[in-house]
Amino acid sequence: KKINLEMVKAGFKQGLYETDTLIADQDRQELVQNFIMDLNVINSEKMMTNAKKIKGAQVFDNGIVLQTIEEGTGKNPTELDDVIVEYILTNALGDTVQSSYQMKKMSGSTEPVALALNGGVIPGWTFVVPKMKKGGKYRTYIPWQMAYGEQAGKESLCFFIELVEIGPGGTLVKPQAPMPQQGGF
């Protein structure tokens, strides 16, 4: 596609002089969101295609890819268990989005993250973590449909996961106490 320089000039003038734009704010927001979603789909498809080519990786029918980096020696959790993990989350471009290691450093904590596989994680984790063994280190590629879906812009994710501990549901992740309600009874 070619860039229409007249439209670019008009856009700069409108921005400079703070005049109305050719596209309404809501329409512009929707266009940008759709553009980002389209880019996410392209980048996600590329990441997932490459992941499926990793030698020795398991590819499941739901599109999830699991690569064993270091096999654990313990048992596998069930979908109803709680787990304690260390993890690094990257997007389809390889940028680190979140890291339990960084969160510990920033908070001064020494504890890994406790998660409930039954409702406390994305569907991809509920499926793939039970394929891991305690003590193991894994990389898993999760298609957007098994991650946060459309609400997160159709972005597929890659996780490095170290499975530290396994416990029956409710033993490692304590239920949150209900917050007191404002305004009395």
Report the location of each language-model feature.
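Cross-family detector of peptidyl-prolyl cis-trans isomerase
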Residues: K1-F185
